[in-house]
């Protein structure tokens, strides 16, 4: 899947290293497909009760829980991804737990957050680049280690 994306998006080695590092960390090494917390915990913590998520009723908190490698949350994000992908995840939210659609959610996030620009910045200022891409400084050391490892491996592989 990543190979197809790198060709289609014409990504450089450092951009692929950044893309893969962010994906690896955010998806817990491709293991995360759905928020593990119970509906009761989600409701109690009011995790997705923010108006920015576009949820219109209490049931939406559970229905549009974090899913996919991009951890899409809320009716609004599900709708935006659905428009882009032409897969109706608003009607069928569980579709985001399918590997190919989950990966596609990551590609969508990459495009939404201008991943190429962030990846180019990563060589100069990884913290700023990663924070800009994810939206906050989360697990930066882990992201940096994976990025450097990817970069080393890919640079060695292309010689």
Regions found by a protein language model. Name each.
Residues 1-4:
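N-terminal export signals and maturation junctions of secreted/periplasmic proteins
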Residues 6-10, 93, 115-120:
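Short helix-to-loop capping/linker segments positioned immediately adjacent to catalytic or ligand/cofactor-binding
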Residues 9-17, 63, 96-101, 124, ...:
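Soluble non-cytosolic domains of exported or imported proteins
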Residues 17-110:
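Peptidoglycan-targeting cell-wall enzymes and recognition modules
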Residues 99-102, 113-123:
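C-terminal folded domains that constitute the principal catalytic or ligand-binding module
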Residues 132-159:
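Low-complexity, Gly/Ser/Thr/Pro-rich intrinsically disordered linker/tail segments
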């Amino acid at each position: 899947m990543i190979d197809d994306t790198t060709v289609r998006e014409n990504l450089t080695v450092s951009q692929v290293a950044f893309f893969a590092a962010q994906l690896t960390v955010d998806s817990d090494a491709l293991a995360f497909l759905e928020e593990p917390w119970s509906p009761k915990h989600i409701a109690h913590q009011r995790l997705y009760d923010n108006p920015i998520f576009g949820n219109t009723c209490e049931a939406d908190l559970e229905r549009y829980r974090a899913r996919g490698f991009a951890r899409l949350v809320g009716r609004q994000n599900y709708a935006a991804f659905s428009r882009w992908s032409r897969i109706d995840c608003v009607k069928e939210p569980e579709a985001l737990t399918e590997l190919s659609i989950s990966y596609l959610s990551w590609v969508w996030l990459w495009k939404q957050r201008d991943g190429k620009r962030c990846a180019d910045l990563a060589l100069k200022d990884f913290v700023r680049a990663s924070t800009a891409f994810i939206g906050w400084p989360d697990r930066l050391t882990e992201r940096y280690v994976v990025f450097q490892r990817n970069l080393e491996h890919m640079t060695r592989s292309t010689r």
